[in-house]
Amino acid sequence: LFCGESGSTLRFLLPVAGALGVDVTFHMQGRLPQRPLAPLDAVLAAHGMTLRRDGALLHAGGRLRPGAYALPGDVSSQYISGLLMALPRLAGESTLTVTGGLESAGYIAMTEDALRLSGICLQKDARTYTVPGGQTAQLPAQCRVEGDWSNAAFFLCMGALSPVGVTVTGLAAASSQGDRAVLDVLRRFGADVRETQDTVTVRRGALHGVTIDAAPIPDLIPVLSVVAALADGQTQIVNAARLRLKESDRLESTAAMLRALGAQVEVHGSGLTVTGRPTLTGGTVDPQHDHRIAMAAATAACGCTAPVTVRDRACTDKSYPRFWADLAALTAVPAAETTKPDEGA
């Protein structure tokens, strides 16, 4: 099973393979073999699976047994989502206890919503899920897939940097998606944010620095750092240690992206300090094969006095293949120039 650099593909389907009792070889690329998997590996091995690594390959076999499972909540919510998908298929009832701090809780809530929509029964008591076995998921004949707040955030942040503003449609106001919090952060920055039932419009206001807790919204930090770089005063981004475990070390790659465009930013152990300026200079950004860094750099072009060139534009295909086409449709002139991996900048 080819995973590419997709952590969610690996972490979701590894326990599902164990629930089905099938032998699977997962093929990983990029930084995925280095991203943390040990807590999930240990739990799966303790409940009947056999796991063997061979470079970028992970060989999995065996069948998961019902029982008491426990996973940390402060490494990756994808561990928990993957097990919640797998446990209903086991032969008997299981429990899953989330230990330690819980980060990215919104993604787990989305998993619960999807499972219940599919007819799966589970109970949650504080930090423990009770999941009956012998269940089969069955989606309704028709169901509506929500708009993606994580990808919409780039355009909403462009709106916060533009007096004209940007309107995004198809976003569920009552969504469980954690990255819906982008609106709250933009309001705190001072942006003009207006919502209807499924439409959001964001325009520039008198932007000022804020403090951002990265723990529940790690994927928003690159693009929110761009807004911080164009806001008055300092912005402190805290509790961001997990960003070092993404497709790139996102603390360092976010800082490198901002510096390449003329921003003032400092990296400390688990966060960033960004000092805003009225404009950025523009320049060339190497996103380090990280889709969110590339899209954040394109967002920054809204506040630059010269063009932004983004190398390796294809890295955005991982999460948003139409990003550059949608950006071109939105702007009268290209907001950022892009190059393929084998092209010069």
Task: Annotate each PLM feature.
Residues 1-345:
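Short, structured segments at the rim of ligand-binding sites
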